[in-house]
Amino acid sequence: MLNEADSLALLAARGIPVVPYRLCRSRAEAVAAFEQIGGPVVVKGCSADIAHKSELGLVKLGVNTREEAGEVWAQMEGIIRKHGARFDGVIIAAMAAGRREIMIGAHRDPVFGPVVAVGDGGKYVEIFRDTALLLPPFSKAEAMDALGSLRIAPLFAGVRGEPPMDVDSLCDAAVRIGELMLDPAAGVMSLDLNPVLLDSAGKGCVVVDAVIFRE
């Protein structure tokens, strides 16, 4: 498993929008990252040995000062080392905005090969299971059709006077994930991007959290 910083870097290299972040290996770097990104920020422990960070207290939202960023960095390091996991650093990331949490996942099926899933995201993704499957390579039009099959699809057009959401950017990200899964040099076995924050038309989407497994 890649750590989250490496996962985000891999996605960004493929043209997939990710939240602005810095990987900090010292308290001083965490303070500098806070000043560079600007508060409030999210602080997350980073370890290739830990996939679900929130369950261990390795995610802190709304950090508002440089002093707090340094303090939380030290706390995250302590938690990771306490659990005997590899300490890869601490991520300082911008507090991304969006109107809907979306999930993009992918895996290698023994029969069909690479499969990409898109659907409603967030912490209840496994409860509501509102997803559609795509077999790469697929086009943006095919991704659009898949999103249109979701139960949440009416929300994309905007309801109760809300503007439409930027589904075009989401389709572009899905297509790029399909291309990534088809690239043997990348060696990606599976990935889970949740949430991908989808904003209003023209404002794009952004990957906030990523878990990627490679060969």
Where is each model-derived feature located?
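ATP-dependent carboxylate/acyl-activation modules
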Residues: 1-215
